[in-house]
């Protein structure tokens, strides 16, 4: 459903949820509906109070409200979308032949670069422009950067002339790379491992990136934070499908990942979770809920 419709429903004072089942197959045999099945009731004569944030668990609602009161910035503020990296016009100045190249798709000859995607680092761009602008080794004397993506179903980094990649806030910073499609959206599941992006490395649309750090240590600390149960519990409030878009990170608080943080990042993931529980003043019941509903990541 459209975002505007969802927001309208969540802020409707006359709407309430009567029933929710996350596993749609329990309601409709052999049917997988991402996000589950919900039955709502609307009474225009009665005010029920706006839902605002919907979760299947009452304890999770109280956790969200506690954390929200202390959130100054959200992790979504430093999440960069799959489409955030772009080509420059210079690539086509140096390689005008790309615009006239074709390929066979579903038995038809089509342009190599799809209409409207001239500057996009699409998920299959390595296969399309391999040994044209993307290479396994540096070419010539021009300065190169690396792009992280997939080629022949494997994660790889390929070199490209720096002048062919548009300026980006985290290209020359440390960051994390996550697949743009990750997991199923089931609450508490384990996430696919992230990769630390070094300085001078960007990504194709197969990935999102998080952070623009001056030090590698900050990226490592973020990586540890995202293995924490509390962070993932808050992520899966909005991440109800495999889609790993920027907006689903809204309720995950941004932390200070430097050595000056109020969190001791040298500790284990489990010990960091305990620090976070204290920071957000969670009760024993709230902690038990997270510990029993969110799978461990070491």
Give the positions of each predicted feature.
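C-terminal substrate-recognition regions of SAM-dependent nucleic acid methyltransferases
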Residues: 31-204, 211-263, 267-284
């Amino acid at each position: 459903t459209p975002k505007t419709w969802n927001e309208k429903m969540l802020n409707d004072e006359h709407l309430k949820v009567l029933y929710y089942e996350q596993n749609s197959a329990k309601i409709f045999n052999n049917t997988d509906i991402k996000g589950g099945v919900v039955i709502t009731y609307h009474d225009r004569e009665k005010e029920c109070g706006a839902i605002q944030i919907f979760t299947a668990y009452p304890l999770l609602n109280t956790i969200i409200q506690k954390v929200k009161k202390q959130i100054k910035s959200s992790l979504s503020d430093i999440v960069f979308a799959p489409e955030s990296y772009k080509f420059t016009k210079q690539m086509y100045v140096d390689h005008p032949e790309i615009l006239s190249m074709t390929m066979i798709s579903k038995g038809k000859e089509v342009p190599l670069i799809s209409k409207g995607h001239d500057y996009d680092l699409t998920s299959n761009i390595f296969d399309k422009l391999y040994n044209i602008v993307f290479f396994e080794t540096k070419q010539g004397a021009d300065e190169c950067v690396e792009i992280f993506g997939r080629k022949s179903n494997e994660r790889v980094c390929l070199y490209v002339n720096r002048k062919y990649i548009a300026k980006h806030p985290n290209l020359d910073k440390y960051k994390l790379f996550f697949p743009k499609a990750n997991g199923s959206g089931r609450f508490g599941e384990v996430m696919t491992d992230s990769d630390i992006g070094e300085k001078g490395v960007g990504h194709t649309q197969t990935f999102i990136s998080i952070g623009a750090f001056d030090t590698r240590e900050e990226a490592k600390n973020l990586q540890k934070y995202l293995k924490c149960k509390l962070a993932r519990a808050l992520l899966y409030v909005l991440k109800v499908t495999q889609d790993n878009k920027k907006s689903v990170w809204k309720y995950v608080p941004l932390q200070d990942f430097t050595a000056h943080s109020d969190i001791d990042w040298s500790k284990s993931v489990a010990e960091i979770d305990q620090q976070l529980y204290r920071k957000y003043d969670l009760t024993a019941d709230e902690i038990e809920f997270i510990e029993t509903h969110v799978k461990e990541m070491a």
